[in-house]
């Protein structure tokens, strides 16, 4: 007899969404749908969640113990996610910021994205309204580097096609994390693509979770214009992170 594969339930983003005392074997198949059989696949892979963050949830993400404001905001956002799938509540965007890197912004952003993916999956199982493309993670700093390389290689290069493909994925997803926005000055060409993405999402009423090391009010100086910064701040709640770097605590 073939033995069913086992897994560590503490790594599953479903762990806080199933009834207490549920035998993990009962939701192994659902775990695989989200994480993949090897832990590298499933819905989280499709959403481009970095591997180190795929086990996180807003209930126990490491930075929250030291970030009171962020912890309260995470709880509110989790509640709103549930209302979204139950009653169609329209979600707002969130702007997670701190002056110091490594305070847990990306960690919490991914934890929230994981939660949204899990709730979307459960809504689908229950026959409730859900999203075909629920979520996507985009590292804006890396995306800008990809753009610079693509421009150097030409508009018909494979690199430019890959850059545009990420733009399309981030436009299609209902919820997106735009990580490290405003981390460095943007060229006019890249800024145009970033504005296209942000504007399309705002116009479609799709929520975005931004992370940044600059406050919203400082974005015009980083971008060299106010138009894009204003779009980022539209229908968006700012959440401040404090303290020094906590990297290594994931």
Please place each PLM-identified region on the residue numbering.
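A short, basic N-terminal segment
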Residues: 1-83, 237-239, 243, 247-250
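Walker A/P-loop nucleotide-binding motif
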Residues: 87-110
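Residue-level preference for the first positions of well-ordered beta-strands
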Residues: 91-95, 135, 175, 207-209
């Amino acid at each position: 007899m073939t033995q069913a594969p086992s897994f560590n339930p503490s790594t599953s983003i479903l762990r806080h969404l199933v009834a207490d005392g549920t035998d993990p074997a009962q939701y192994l198949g659902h775990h695989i749908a989200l994480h993949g059989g090897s832990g590298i696949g499933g819905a989280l892979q499709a959403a481009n969640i970095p591997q180190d963050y795929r086990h996180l949830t807003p209930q126990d993400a490491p930075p929250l113990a030291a970030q009171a404001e962020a912890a309260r905001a995470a709880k509110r956002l989790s509640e709103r996610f549930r209302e979204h799938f139950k009653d169609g509540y329209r979600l707002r965007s969130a702007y997670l910021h701190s002056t110091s890197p490594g305070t847990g912004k990306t960690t919490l952003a991914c934890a929230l994205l994981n939660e949204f993916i899990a709730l979307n999956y459960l809504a689908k199982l229950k026959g409730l309204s859900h999203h075909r493309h629920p979520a996507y993670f985009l590292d804006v700093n890396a995306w800008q580097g990809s753009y610079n390389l693509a421009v150097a290689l030409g508009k018909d290069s494979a690199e430019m096609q890959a850059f545009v493909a990420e733009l399309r994925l981030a436009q299609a997803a209902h919820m997106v994390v735009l990580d490290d926005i405003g981390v460095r000055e943007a060229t006019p060409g890249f800024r145009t693509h970033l504005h296209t993405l942000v504007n399309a999402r705002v116009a479609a009423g799709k929520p975005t979770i931004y992370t940044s090391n600059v406050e919203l009010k400082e974005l015009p100086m980083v971008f060299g214009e106010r138009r894009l910064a204003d779009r980022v701040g539209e229908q968006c709640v700012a959440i401040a992170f404090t303290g020094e770097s906590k990297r290594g605590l994931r």
